[in-house]
Amino acid sequence: MAVWALGINHSTAPLDLRGRFAFALDQIAPRLQGLRQSLSSHPGVETAMLSTCNRTEIYCAAEQAAIDHTLGWLAHSGGVSTALLRAHSYTLQDSRAARHAFRVASGLDSMVLGEAQILGQMKDAVRAAETAGVLGSTLNQLFQRSFAVAKEVRSSTEIGAHSISMAAAAVRLAGQLFEDLSQIRVLFVGAGAMIALCATHFAAKNPLGLALANRTLERGEQLAARFGATVLRLADLPERLHEFDAVISCTASSLPIIGLGAVERALKKRRHRPMFMVDLAVPRDIEPEVKALGDVYLYTVDDLASVVQTGQASRQAAVAQAEAIIDAGVQSFMHWLAQRNPVGGVVPLIRQLNAQTEVWRASEIARAKKLLAKGEAPDAVLDALARGLTQKMLHGTMAELRAGDADMRAQTAQTVARLFLRAQSNHDL
């Protein structure tokens, strides 16, 4: 059984395609259970799913045939052809899959180099797989080692130093459009972690006003209270949109919530004063046609990439250090995996040896109990038990010593001496 990572990310797939595969956290466990049912002809497969704004990945411990099926299942889930998904996806096996997982956890594969949020998202993915009952010992080991590597990378390097977050990038872009951010009104749509971070950055600029719209009013009020923002109902957005100079949106909606018509009406009421809009959602919150409007400056999560990547060149030394830590982690994991390989692996052999010796032990114990029940002397019974175990353990070895040609017997003799006469050799020393 091999370890696999397959999926799409910001480097391989455009925003709209990624949007088809953006699954909310509470959707992941049910989808993994559905995947397991579709893999019923491949028993023992382990799976986990990571879904963020910038990537959707499935990690598997499985054979090749199960991976081919999984890619088709994922394509069907997103409503696209397998050929289209394959053209924009990657499928990585064993050491490449482990390296990818370690790089993702460490923030090296993120749009924002060194960002820490992905580590928490990976831990959420593990919990979802556990809830679905599809994680398994192999993937659990992969993820636990991913977390350990990520911790070492962050504590031993400066990979996250001086990075620019998406939220900070949004503020920087707004500053290029508006001369004074303290003279604008800002609307946030959504109440998740990304909106909270954006609100923190914009609030630091002391704008004229902050407002927040959310589908769940209570949750919106809780976040708004932290920044002194007013709260709007999501249904009121079309009629209130013109009041705001900047709109930052990031919800989990499967469909756009700010349409072209609403923005056109807002611009008319604003007498075509410019509007700054940032859509951090995947799939989109704001209809893409809005970008064509002359007085709107609309940025998506992909548009912010060039801003957040500023300064990454100066952190290449930290990247090199991180890659060295990851290299060591990959080697360690692959050694662990090889030991558990059914063909030639140490762990399966140890299990077989333990099972065989347990059969011998049980057989000799049963024989000893019968002898004791017949009134045999305990010393004689113990001697027979020990002799019986010794004969069973050495029978195969003795047969191998007599088999084969002279060279083979000599090699076998060296191995047997190393295994069975080690204690005697140490005693002689």
From Swiss-Prot:
<dbReference type="GO" id="GO:0050661">
    <property type="term" value="F:NADP binding"/>
</dbReference>
<keyword id="KW-0521">NADP</keyword>
<dbReference type="InterPro" id="IPR006151">
    <property type="entry name" value="Shikm_DH/Glu-tRNA_Rdtase"/>
</dbReference>
<dbReference type="InterPro" id="IPR000343">
    <property type="entry name" value="4pyrrol_synth_GluRdtase"/>
</dbReference>
<comment type="similarity">
    <text>Belongs to the glutamyl-tRNA reductase family.</text>
</comment>
<comment type="pathway">
    <text>Porphyrin-containing compound metabolism; protoporphyrin-IX biosynthesis; 5-aminolevulinate from L-glutamyl-tRNA(Glu): step 1/2.</text>
</comment>
<feature type="binding site">
    <location>
        <position position="121"/>
    </location>
    <ligand>
        <name>substrate</name>
    </ligand>
</feature>
<dbReference type="Pfam" id="PF01488">
    <property type="entry name" value="Shikimate_DH"/>
</dbReference>
<comment type="function">
    <text>Catalyzes the NADPH-dependent reduction of glutamyl-tRNA(Glu) to glutamate 1-semialdehyde (GSA).</text>
</comment>
<dbReference type="InterPro" id="IPR036291">
    <property type="entry name" value="NAD(P)-bd_dom_sf"/>
</dbReference>
<dbReference type="GO" id="GO:0008883">
    <property type="term" value="F:glutamyl-tRNA reductase activity"/>
</dbReference>
<feature type="site" description="Important for activity">
    <location>
        <position position="100"/>
    </location>
</feature>
<feature type="active site" description="Nucleophile">
    <location>
        <position position="53"/>
    </location>
</feature>
<feature type="binding site">
    <location>
        <begin position="52"/>
        <end position="55"/>
    </location>
    <ligand>
        <name>substrate</name>
    </ligand>
</feature>
<feature type="binding site">
    <location>
        <position position="110"/>
    </location>
    <ligand>
        <name>substrate</name>
    </ligand>
</feature>
<dbReference type="Pfam" id="PF00745">
    <property type="entry name" value="GlutR_dimer"/>
</dbReference>
<feature type="binding site">
    <location>
        <begin position="190"/>
        <end position="195"/>
    </location>
    <ligand>
        <name>NADP(+)</name>
    </ligand>
</feature>
<dbReference type="InterPro" id="IPR015896">
    <property type="entry name" value="4pyrrol_synth_GluRdtase_dimer"/>
</dbReference>
<dbReference type="InterPro" id="IPR015895">
    <property type="entry name" value="4pyrrol_synth_GluRdtase_N"/>
</dbReference>
<protein>
    <recommendedName>
        <fullName>Glutamyl-tRNA reductase</fullName>
        <ecNumber>1.2.1.70</ecNumber>
    </recommendedName>
</protein>
<dbReference type="GO" id="GO:0019353">
    <property type="term" value="P:protoporphyrinogen IX biosynthetic process from glutamate"/>
</dbReference>
<dbReference type="Pfam" id="PF05201">
    <property type="entry name" value="GlutR_N"/>
</dbReference>
<dbReference type="InterPro" id="IPR018214">
    <property type="entry name" value="GluRdtase_CS"/>
</dbReference>
<keyword id="KW-0627">Porphyrin biosynthesis</keyword>
<dbReference type="InterPro" id="IPR036343">
    <property type="entry name" value="GluRdtase_N_sf"/>
</dbReference>
<dbReference type="InterPro" id="IPR036453">
    <property type="entry name" value="GluRdtase_dimer_dom_sf"/>
</dbReference>
<keyword id="KW-0560">Oxidoreductase</keyword>
<comment type="subunit">
    <text>Homodimer.</text>
</comment>
<feature type="binding site">
    <location>
        <begin position="115"/>
        <end position="117"/>
    </location>
    <ligand>
        <name>substrate</name>
    </ligand>
</feature>
